[in-house]
Amino acid sequence: MNKWNYGVFFVNFYNKGQQEPSKTMNNALETLRIIDEDTSIYDVINIDDHYLVKKDSEDKKLASFITLGEKLYVLATSENTVDIAAKYALPLVFKWDDINEERLKLLSFYNASASKYNKNIDLVRHQLMLHVNVNEAETVAKEELKLYIENYVACTQPSNFNGSIDSIIQSNVTGSYKDCLSYVANLAGKFDNTVDFLLCFESMQDQNKKKSVMIDLNNQVIKFRQDNNLI
């Protein structure tokens, strides 16, 4: 892992007719390798009043966008970016390295901007990136996650490394399987159930446990979607 490349986020949503849950894990609909917004990996877009226009000039750079399948999302990097997304009712992707307070502040700003522009966002669903490390020993889970992200945090937030990395870990998902599910459910409630989740399990060092957790969680998603007639 270098400073620009810090996780593969799997979108493990269940397709109707998919009979084998593990296939959804092994053949995820999309794998998203999150890259620092200032690199050239993302397409950078300038949104004008009528359509999306890609711009090459640095001074025209307004927002990073991410495509998942056929859907377009705007990376929630600032209030300005969020305001632009709301103007066109585009959904957001919230970053894993923002603390929950910052994510919620940006969501509130998005909602206020949508109201300002008279945009109906009732059907808009955002994505929230989360690192997940499941371990009955919560301290082990936190240490593994810290080891996985510390190079990136040291490069991006060197002046407050210890405080930053602790806050980031607290705003991601670590602990027992039950505690992790409870945390995600609670977080969904804080976001008024307007977000889906991009989950990264790469910090888990036990590869067999990681695969087991992904399959179990995928089954949980399938059951939830079946119970709520979402498939």
UniProtKB/Swiss-Prot annotation:
Transmembrane segments: none annotated. Its cofactor is FMN. Keywords: Flavoprotein. GO terms for molecular function: alkanal monooxygenase (FMN-linked) activity. Binds 2 FMN per subunit. Each FMN has a myristate attached. This flavin-fatty acid linkage is probably the result of an enzyme-catalyzed reaction, most likely the bioluminescence reaction itself. The keyword Flavoprotein applies. InterPro entries: Bacterial_luciferase_CS, Luciferase-like_sf, Luciferase_bac/NFP. Homodimer. Belongs to the bacterial luciferase oxidoreductase family. This is Non-fluorescent flavoprotein. The lineage of its organism: Bacteria, Pseudomonadati, Pseudomonadota, Gammaproteobacteria, Vibrionales. The gene is luxF.
